[in-house]
Amino acid sequence: MIINNVKLVLDDEVVHGSLEVHDGRILAFAESQSRLPQALDGEGGWLLPGLIELHTDNLDKFFTPRPKVDWPAHSAMSSHDAMMVASGITTVLDAVAIGDVRDGGDRLENLEKMVNAVEETQKRGLNRAEHRLHLRCELPHHTTLPLFEKLIDRESVSMVSLMDHSPGQRQYADRSKYRDYYQGKYHLTHDEMDRFEAEQMALAATWSQPNRQTIAAMCRARRIALASHDDATEAHVAESHQLGSVIAEFPTTLAAAQASRQHGMHVLMGAPNIVRGGSHSGNVAAHQLASHGLLDILSSDYYPASLLDAAFRIADAEDNAFTLPQAIRLVSQHPAQALGLDDRGVIAEGKRADLVLAHRRGEHIQINHVWRQGKRVF
């Protein structure tokens, strides 16, 4: 396959030319046009490496499209997969939550179904993107470690993150924000919220630190990429580094992001944060970290189409020094490096032909075609 007349977004430059794919790999590219009649005309669009998503909880909404509605697993997985490739994502880590902040939630009911759906569809070759698992461990819960121990040795597990959403911790250092969020989410009265908050603090006191230490040790022993989550202080970051974290997910302050970089961790922020212009919870904005040169990886989080959109917005912004190739690395090469996937994430000879052809229509980035290992999947 030859793709002609495209702007190739390489590691550190953009060149106008053509690219040839053979046997699922990039055979060659050139700053010239192919004259072969079978070459696909890219019509001057951008040819990018396939996007790599490390943290999406998009799968949840297809398994439970409405409260108490349970959707068939393979149908849910197929719909989720279609949305991923339509967003230019060719490698996706589906984030599944281990443990829940409230007994009786949908997370535990869906966990086994989601894990099995990801693995079965991947093994059977039904997915258009390559799907792996990201285990999001809610530390202050008695069910977290037993569930984690059942899943950690599954072949599809590529990443683990350590979360603590208890009152006064990380994202909820301001306990009034904690109360506002969970009281609204669960429709609690003031008395019910008081009891819920007390219960969560008791659970955190019992389970958070033992689970944090044990899960981190198990990841180190297996060389599975470990991520912190919502670190707010230099002390949080120092602890995360000591535990072996290589990724800092969503640091909530500039100080935490700076400390994460100093400790050699990849700083990951949400692409919706870039598109919307700030954090929905009032934390440090991703564009602020970009302007300080502290942004390494973007994740679509809860909105898959935000990933490529955010990369182009960063390249366009005047308050940072990112070129387009550098911005595209945030959604391709850098996440690949964080996971040790050295066969993808960049347009280079010998790499996997995971590719995205996109055009700019005014301020909108339109994805026209997507290939995974040289096969067109969108």
Predicted region positions:
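Active-site glycine- and acidic-residue-rich loops that bind
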Residues: 135-146, 230-235, 239, 247-249, ...
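Histidine-rich, glycine-flanked metal-binding segment
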Residues: 1, 8-48
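Metal-associated gating/positioning segment near the N- to mid-region
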Residues: 45-114
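His/Asp/Glu-enriched, well-ordered alpha-helical/loop segment
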Residues: 263-273, 277-358
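Glycine-enriched alpha-helix->loop->beta-strand junction motifs that scaffold or abut catalytic
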Residues: 154-158, 240-247, 262-268, 293-296
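C-terminal cap of metal-dependent C-N hydrolases
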Residues: 6, 333, 337, 349-378
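Metal-coordinating catalytic core of metallo-dependent amide/deamination hydrolases
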Residues: 99-231, 301
